[in-house]
A protein has these predicted regions:
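Active-site catalytic loop in hydrolytic enzyme cores
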Residues: 72-87, 114, 139-166, 320-395, ...
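A structure-centric signal for secondary-structure junctions around beta-strands
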Residues: 64, 145-148, 221-225, 268-269, ...
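Flexible, glycine-rich phosphate/dinucleotide-binding loops
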Residues: 157, 235, 312, 333, ...
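Short, conserved active-site loops that position catalytic residues or coordinate cofactors/metal ions
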Residues: 23-38, 62-69, 73, 230-231, ...
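CN hydrolase (nitrilase-like) catalytic-core segments centered on the catalytic cysteine
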Residues: 96, 278-279, 284-305, 317, ...
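Conserved hydrophobic/aromatic beta-strand scaffold that supports enzyme active sites
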Residues: 20, 105, 228, 324-326, ...
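Membrane-embedded alpha-helical bundles of multi-pass enzymes
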Residues: 1-215, 419-420, 431-434, 446-454, ...
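Soluble catalytic regions of membrane-associated enzymes that act on cell-envelope
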Residues: 213-345, 376-380, 386, 390-392, ...
Length: 526
């Protein structure tokens, strides 16, 4: 199929836009299913250098439309002017667009190196494997990785399809979306009736699984109730030293909410959870320490709370950690977890030596020191693992808690920094998949939303509205057993990496010089 360049360019831009529109707050998940194939079609038999541009523009479009809230965070809370904030969003979009650019370049290269007939098959078979391989690379490369809004999350709108994540992780769902899209493109390129029939049958099977699959997903019966307190503190770029004293009336209100909810829950001992530091909470603050211990004692159970934990290192220098702490019913500290995966430009400044301007972004909190272990805590009914905010988007890291014996997952987060943007809904969408991958109940407590209880199959069992100071009586249970994903990790994503290399090598091995020579001499479409 020969398309003019303007049509190819429009396909590339539209594919990026459709992929972005499949996520909150646009909420058109079906738009993701044709997106990858549209980019394949744009690059098929095109010059690799030009396809590199198509992929790059696809990526820039996708990020500008799907994570525009980065501009809001940087401007309102990062102490930077609007122009610099917009520049940071643009720089992130340009940097991450490298991954779809590589995808587009490879598809074009394979389709031009092989003779007609074979090239369409190879390009479309390679497509889902390479797409997943590059999403996996995005999870770890560049600033510690940014696997936000991976393609597979669009498929999680279907409870039935979502269950695949327990075997392959989120990457299997990305593969499913990309593979279907590529099959349809192959039907278009091949023009053969048998391929169209295969595409139609696949479409029917996906609709059946997507719509009817939820009826086959078993129920999960909870036996416990936790009290998740949504603190709803407004975010500020600066916090005065007397913040606790100034806000003591609000803290006392939260204490009443926490204690009364625990006493009324009928759960003995109870579990009260507060989110990731919504304000400058620290046990170096005597007033806050007294308040936290009082909540634990009066609730008659355990109290999990996010704090800034200050400690001296070997040289005597004070260092801060983003920490979750568990207090027992006597007010004693029984468990500590330090956040291991920090937010670049939010909790630390990468490449500080070169990016001197970025120090302003963490001026209000200083750099955090990352934790070094995925330790689990103990509750009367079993063991739990708690991951903090940004860590929810990294499947392999959450998996570590289950491997270390966690029977319950707890995610505490402060999404107040995102304002009323799409980010909190996107964050919940991704955290929900961690419950399925690990087959564990997930308790998610946030400062201003979305606070929810998610069962091991991805159902949101209970939640409360955003921007409200209240508590959620959240059902949960402790679960045993390990899913294939927990046992074997990112095996599917790594398989896609190997398959991508294998298909590219095979494509070059299949090359017919005379066909390649003819195409090389042919006139470029335009």
């Amino acid at each position: 199929m020969r398309l003019p360049r303007y049509a190819r360019l429009l396909l590339a831009l539209a594919s990026g836009a459709l992929l972005a529109f499949s996520f909150p707050n646009y909420n058109f998940p079906l738009f993701a299913w044709p997106a990858v194939g549209m980019l394949v079609l744009a690059c098929f038999e095109e010059r690799p250098a030009i396809s590199l541009l198509y992929g790059f523009l696809h990526g820039v479009t996708f990020y500008l439309l799907s994570v525009p809230w980065i501009d809001t965070v940087m401007h309102q809370y990062g102490n930077v002017d609007p122009l610099t904030a917009a520049g940071i969003l643009g720089l992130l979009s340009v940097t991450l667009a490298v991954f779809p650019a590589v995808f587009a370049w490879a598809i074009a290269l394979v389709s031009r190196k092989l003779p007609p007939g074979k090239n369409a098959l190879f390009a479309c078979v390679l497509s889902p494997f390479l797409w997943v391989a590059l999403e996996y690379a995005r999870t770890y490369l560049i600033l510690g990785g940014f696997p936000w809004n991976l393609t597979g999350y669009a498929a999680t709108a279907s409870l039935g399809l979502l269950q695949l994540a327990a075997i392959t992780g989120i990457y299997g769902l990305s593969f499913l979306v990309a593979a279907y899209s590529s099959l349809v493109v192959y039907a278009i390129l091949a023009g053969r009736q048998v391929v169209w029939k295969a595409a139609l049958v696949t479409t029917g099977a996906l609709i059946l699984a997507g719509v009817g699959g939820k009826y086959l997903v078993p129920a999960a019966v909870p036996h416990h109730v936790a009290n998740l307190v949504q603190t709803d503190f407004p975010q500020s770029a600066e916090y005065p030293a007397n913040w606790t004293q100034v806000h003591m009336n609000e803290l006392t209100q939260l204490e009443r909410i926490s204690v009364s909810a625990a006493q009324e829950s009928g759960e003995h001992p109870s579990l009260v959870v507060w989110p990731e530091v919504p304000a400058p909470f620290s046990f170096q603050d005597p007033m806050f320490t007294q308040l936290a211990q009082q909540i634990a004692r009066e609730s008659g159970g355990d109290f999990l709370v996010g704090i800034v934990d200050w400690r001296k290192d070997a040289t005597g220098k004070w260092q801060a950690s983003n920490t979750a702490v568990l207090l027992d019913s006597s007010g004693q500290r029984t468990f500590t977890y330090d956040k291991t995966h920090l937010v670049p430009f939010g909790e630390f400044v990468p490449y500080r030596r070169w990016l001197t301007f970025a120090g302003k972004l963490t001026a209000d909190i200083g750099d955090f020191t990352p934790g070094s272990s995925f330790n689990v805590g103990k509750l009367p009914g079993g063991k739990f693992g708690v991951f903090i905010c940004y860590e929810a988007i990294f499947p392999a890291e959450v998996r570590e808690f289950t491997l270390h014996g966690a029977q319950l997952l707890i995610n505490i987060s402060n999404d107040g920094w995102f304002g009323r943007s799409a980010a909190p809904a996107q964050h919940l969408m991704m955290a929900r998949v961690r419950a399925v991958e690990n087959r564990r109940w997930l308790l998610r407590d946030t400062n201003n939303g979305f606070t929810a209880s998610v069962d091991p199959y991805g159902r949101i069992v209970s939640e409360i509205p955003t921007d409200v100071r209240t508590e959620l009586s959240a059902p949960y249970d402790f679960r045993q057993g390990l899913t294939p994903y927990v046992r074997f990790g990112d095996w599917f994503a790594r398989l896609c990496i190997l398959a991508s290399f294998a298909f590219i090598i095979l494509a070059f091995a299949q090359r017919q010089p005379q066909a390649a020579g003819k195409r090389k001499g042919s006139k470029s479409n335009g």
